[in-house]
Amino acid sequence: TGQGSPTGIAIYEGDLLPKVFQGQMMHCDAGPRVVRAYPVTKSGAGYKGEIVNMLQSKDPWYRPSDVCTAPDGSVFVADWHDGHVGGHHMTDHKPGQMTGRIYRLTPKGKNTQYTISKKRTALSMLSSPNMAARYIGWQQLNKVGAKAESTLGKLWKGDDQRPRARALHLLARIKGLEKKYIGAALKDANPD
């Protein structure tokens, strides 16, 4: 990042933001005061990336430090600042001197009201854009073990590669079924 100072990083798994960000890495860089996405495309045996700025400011106190995706697909950016970046002379250890902001990124014109009234199942949580929700779903499905095989099998046969990988991870943990699912994964048509 040149003179940058990379901090928070996450993969955007939502579909609320424009297509260019979907499935791509997001990264905070406090030095140049920017949150970027790094869309990648396949290139031979590897990948080629580009840089797309998501949130940038000339405000000298803007220091994006972390990024995450909310359950609705919006993105939260933590902007935390201390008196001397890097913590050499921290002046934000006392209430009243602490400084920071949280930004929520959503597309213009989209309803930004979030509701939790939607019924969430462990399986739907496993496909959530939010990492904490995915982990809760993973824990619940892992706990029931073999009873979740049928449900996880449907996700494993789906088209979305990330939920497929999560389903495979759980299926391969079921005692007695490890070889079945690892063998199926090795024969899978997706090279990734």
List the predicted regions and their residue ranges:
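Short alpha-helical
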Residues: 33, 147, 192
